Amino acid sequence: MAKGEFVRTKPHVNVGTIGHVDHGKTTLTAALTYVAAAENPNVEVKDYGDIDKAPEERARGITINTAHVEYETAKRHYSHVDCPGHADYIKNMITGAAQMDGAILVVSAADGPMPQTREHILLARQVGVPYIVVFMNKVDMVDDPELLDLVEMEVRDLLNQYEFPGDEVPVIRGSALLALEQMHRNPKTRRGENEWVDKIWELLDAIDEYIPTPVRDVDKPFLMPVEDVFTITGRGTVATGRIERGKVKVGDEVEIVGLAPETRRTVVTGVEMHRKTLQEGIAGDNVGVLLRGVSREEVERGQVLAKPGSITPHTKFEASVYVLKKEEGGRHTGFFSGYRPQFYFRTTDVTGVVQLPPGVEMVMPGDNVTFTVELIKPVALEEGLRFAIREGGRTVGAGVVTKILE
């Protein structure tokens, strides 16, 4: 059954709330669903309690608590992620369990930016969250308008420090709680009927306008991680896997990238799904790709098939990493430079050597750290690629490539 249609009239965008504990991320998330629901019968309201007791999910062997809500505006459909705990944010952003096309940074006007505000902005920069919109919350608790200006200036400075365009980022001032209380009193409150509800609309407008609709996976250059390889007598070698992005059809040139000393170029002579011929395989399809003139020995699990020139093999990179705590099934002890675990990229493990940054002697379970890795074999890498760190098959950490070195 190819190409079942999921009918969606509006473009889809993934967002999430980030920011310091108790600055109002979850209250704002609830308010967004209520406000959007008043104008759109398709939106399901979620209350603070529904969001706060976020279900556990697993991503790359790590347990994370994450709440997912959905809402829509006249222009777009949104999936929104909110995490109850600070550690959940770190794990979520590093594993990419909840990819964000843009983030809503919540800052309490009463406190201004706090340590986790900074940490979440840094994480957003490292893991490649491309856009941030700011909601300055709890402005009803601040009497002095100059103080509000000061907090806004501090937030913009902080964004600039981490290479976000702090001077251009929209900053909306409001009170998530007062908006939510109004929606509880009258769930049908519309735009223009209450000043605090209007602030939530102002935020929705800013998200609509400022965060661009992302390029769909299917429109990106073709890439398929190889999961398995077999031979069809008389026809040649087939590589199977799930297409990560782009599309592929007979006659396309592709490269086999990674693990081997040389990147090899070949031509696709067939694309199959469940033993039936496909006109074209697209992102998300599990397919077999028949490769011209390639022997069974020349392609293996862990390599990728990709559009020529779109991705290259590398051995050395910098990464942002979360190291699992003992209670999460991680190591019981710390590790030093020279540590040699396996790095699991897409479909395979490759051994690598860790080099800690200057001034860091040792990394403990539960830490979030940036370090350099040198792999013993080249792998198809790019910035933003997620991986797991494993020892003997069990996950001890999760990371994201932040910079390619060689």
Curated annotation (Swiss-Prot):
Domain of life according to the entry: Bacteria
Modifications the protein undergoes after translation, according to the UniProt entry: Phosphorylated on a threonine.
Binding site for Mg(2+): 26
Subunit record text: Monomer. Binds to the 70S ribosome, contacts tmRNA during trans-translation.
Binding site for GTP: 19-26, 82-86, 137-140
Places the protein is found: Cytoplasm
Protein name as annotated: Elongation factor Tu-A
List of residues that carry Phosphothreonine: 395
Catalytic activity: GTP + H2O = GDP + phosphate + H(+)
Gene symbol of the encoding locus: tufA
Span of domain tr-type G: 10-215
